[in-house]
C-alpha cells in the first residue's frame, strides 16, 4: 500500500542547479529535504562538495549531511536504510520529503532495491585486492575477475576499480560470482512509497560553463586550504571513499607530492575540471538508464523546472 504523501526525487548532474531548485520548492510548501550525495555525508568537506553553508542549512535544513568523518564508509545500503527511516518519520508528521542530489547509485537503490543477502564489505578482503592492484596493476585484478566471473568482465572495464573490487570481494567471501547472486536474489524495494521523479538535464555546453564557474570559485575561496586542514586532522589516503571524490582526489595527490610549482598546480586544477566533467557525463548516463525503467519528468532549464514544479506543488 502506498502512502498518501509522495516522495519527490529531484536529480541532476553536478552544478545543474538542483539544490537551489529544491530550496525554492522547500519555501513553497510542507516539505523537508534529504540529501542524496555521497560526498556531502562527510564532515569537514565543505568547499569541494559545494555543501550548503551553515546559514543556508539553517534556512533549508538538509538531512544526511555531515553525518560521518572522511575516514568512514557510507554505502548505498546504509543510505536506503537512513532515507527510508527519514521518509517514514516525515510522513508521520504530514511532511513531503524532497530527495535532492546527484548520486545516482543511491537513487537507483532507493527506487529498485538492493540484493538482500549480498555480503557486507570486508576490509581485509578489500585490502588484499588493493594490494594486488598496487603490486601487479589493475589489469591483473581485472583478469582475475574475468576468470571467476566472465559476465562481470563483460559489464566492467579495467577503469571500473570500485566495481571490480566489490565483485571480487563478493566472490572471495561467498565463492560465487556477484552477477549470479544478483540475478538470483530477491530485492528489498520500498514499494510503500509513491515516487515522483524529476531530473534536471541542462544543455551540456551550459553545464560545462557552470562546472568551470563552480571550480573557479572553489579554488578562489580556499579549497586547497580545506584539503590541507583535512590532511592535518585525519590520517587520509587516496583509497578512502571520501578522497575518491572529484577535486579531493586531485588536490590530495598534489599536496602530498614534493613538486608544488605553479605548473603542477595548474595541472591539478585541469585534472579536477576534467574529472568533474566526466562525473557529469556518468550522471547523465545513469539518469538515462533510470528513465528507461521509471517514470520521469525531465527539464532542460531551471526556469522550466521552476514553473512546472510551482504549478505541481506551489
Curated annotation (Swiss-Prot):
Alphabetized GO MF terms = ATP binding; tRNA dimethylallyltransferase activity
Locate the region Interaction with substrate tRNA: 37-40, 162-166
* Biological process, per Gene Ontology: tRNA modification
Q: Where does ATP bind?
A: 12-19
Q: Which domain of life is it from?
A: Bacteria
EC number(s): the record gives 2.5.1.75
The record lists substrate as bound by 14-19
Q: What class of enzyme is it?
A: transferase
Name what cofactor the protein needs: Mg(2+)
Q: Which UniProt keywords apply?
A: ATP-binding, Magnesium, Nucleotide-binding, Transferase, tRNA processing
Q: Which reaction does it catalyse?
A: adenosine(37) in tRNA + dimethylallyl diphosphate = N(6)-dimethylallyladenosine(37) in tRNA + diphosphate
Q: Which Gene3D superfamilies match?
A: 1.10.20.140, P-loop containing nucleotide triphosphate hydrolases
Indicate the annotated site residue(s) for Interaction with substrate tRNA. Answer: 103, 126
Q: How does it assemble?
A: Monomer.
Per the entry, what this protein does is: Catalyzes the transfer of a dimethylallyl group onto the adenine at position 37 in tRNAs that read codons beginning with uridine, leading to the formation of N6-(dimethylallyl)adenosine (i(6)A).
Q: What family is this protein classified in?
A: Belongs to the IPP transferase family.
- Matches recorded under HAMAP family: IPP_trans (MF_00185)
Identification of the protein by name:
tRNA dimethylallyltransferase
Per the UniProt record, the source organism is Acinetobacter baumannii (strain SDF)
Amino acid at each position: 500500500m502506498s502512502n498518501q504523501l509522495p516522495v519527490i526525487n529531484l536529480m541532476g548532474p553536478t552544478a545543474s542547479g538542483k539544490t537551489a531548485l529544491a530550496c525554492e520548492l522547500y519555501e513553497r510548501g510542507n516539505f523537508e529535504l534529504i540529501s542524496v550525495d555521497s560526498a556531502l555525508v562527510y564532515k569537514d568537506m565543505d568547499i569541494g562538495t559545494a555543501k550548503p553553508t551553515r546559514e543556508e542549512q539553517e534556512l533549508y535544513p538538509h538531512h544526511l549531511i555531515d553525518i560521518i568523518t572522511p575516514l568512514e564508509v557510507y554505502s548505498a545500503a546504509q543510505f536506503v536504510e537512513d532515507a527510508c527511516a527519514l521518509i517514514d518519520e516525515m510522513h508521520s508528521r504530514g511532511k513531503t520529503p524532497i530527495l535532492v542530489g546527484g548520486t545516482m547509485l543511491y537513487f537507483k537503490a532507493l527506487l529498485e532495491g538492493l540484493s538482500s543477502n549480498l555480503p557486507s564489505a570486508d576490509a581485509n578482503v578489500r585490502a588484499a585486492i588493493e594490494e594486488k592492484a598496487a603490486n601487479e596493476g589493475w589489469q591483473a585484478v581485472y583478469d582475475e575477475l574475468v576468470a571467476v566471473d566472465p559476465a562481470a568482465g563483460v559489464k566492467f572495464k579495467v577503469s571500473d576499480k570500485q566495481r571490480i573490487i566489490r565483485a571480487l570481494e563478493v566472490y572471495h567471501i561467498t565463492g560465487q560470482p556477484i552477477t549470479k547472486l544478483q540475478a538470483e536474489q530477491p530485492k528489498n524495494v520500498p514499494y510503500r512509497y509513491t515516487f515522483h521523479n524529476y531530473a534536471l538535464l541542462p544543455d551540456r555546453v551550459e553545464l560545462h560553463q557552470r562546472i568551470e564557474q563552480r571550480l573557479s570559485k572553489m579554488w578562489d575561496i580556499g579549497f586547497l586550504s580545506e584539503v590541507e586542514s583535512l590532511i592535518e586532522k585525519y590520517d587520509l589516503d587516496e583509497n578512502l571513499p571520501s578522497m575518491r571524490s572529484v577535486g579531493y582526489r586531485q588536490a590530495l595527490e598534489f599536496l602530498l607530492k614534493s613538486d608544488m610549482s605553479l605548473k603542477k598546480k595548474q595541472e591539478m586544477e585541469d585534472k579536477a575540471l576534467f574529472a568533474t566533467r566526466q562525473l557529469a557525463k556518468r550522471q547523465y548516463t545513469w539518469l538515462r538508464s533510470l528513465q528507461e525503467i521509471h517514470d520521469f519528468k525531465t527539464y532542460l532549464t531551471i526556469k522550466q523546472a521552476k514553473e512546472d514544479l510551482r504549478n505541481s506543488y506551489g
